[in-house]
A protein has these predicted regions:
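Active-site-adjacent structural elements in enzyme catalytic cores
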Residues: 1-187
Length: 187
């Protein structure tokens, strides 16, 4: 269970340029400030991840998301918070996890799964490789998590055309996405 003290420690760690392992609504993540080159390099090095491979920016409330057009904003409000990563125009991926305990975190977090690149998804803290746990500044234990990765949906053209594409199947069924994203296309 995440406490208020955990949330404060997390926000302090991330704000200060640190790297943290933390629970999300799907898997354990490892993250840092997206504007800290050193911290981003640490995250990628800990995972053994190729430097050019993208990572998502996690916000902990809808209010913290970047400005979008009205159609895209309505889609974000229908899908988030929840286990969906949305790719916006320009290729930026954003997430708002369904984590009420973390809702007061006001700093964005560059986040990726807390595993070695290509490794199994960590649903328990013990599943996070020791090399990652030992290489970060803060570790938060949220118990056992669902273990199903987030669904990734590309809304890059959604504002103009209403087109969307699932890039990775995951925790949210495609049928639910279709219901929400095709809503304004119906009569």
């Amino acid at each position: 269970m995440i406490t208020d003290a955990d949330v404060a420690a997390f926000e302090e760690c991330i704000s200060g340029g640190g790297v943290a392992v933390f629970p999300t609504d799907t898997l354990y993540g490892v993250g840092c400030r997206p504007d800290s080159e050193d911290a981003v390099a640490r995250v990628y090095a800990l995972k053994g991840r190729a430097p050019g491979k993208p990572a998502a920016v996690m916000c902990f409330s809808l209010d913290a998301l970047p400005e979008t057009g009205p159609r895209t904003r309505a889609a974000l409000e229908a899908l988030l918070p929840g286990p969906v990563l949305v790719v916006l125009p320009g290729g930026v991926g954003v997430r708002v996890p369904d984590l009420p305990a973390m809702a007061r975190v006001r700093v964005p977090v560059l986040q990726t799964s807390a595993n070695l690149s290509g490794g199994p998804d960590p649903r328990r803290l013990a599943d996070v490789p020791a090399s990652i746990r030992d290489g970060v500044d803060l570790v938060l234990d949220g118990g056992e998590l669902p273990g199903v990765p987030s669904t990734v949906v590309d809304l890059g053209r959604y504002e103009e055309t209403g087109e969307w594409e699932v890039l990775r199947a995951g925790a949210v069924p495609v049928e639910r996405l279709a219901t929400e994203l095709n809503r304004d296309m119906r009569g």
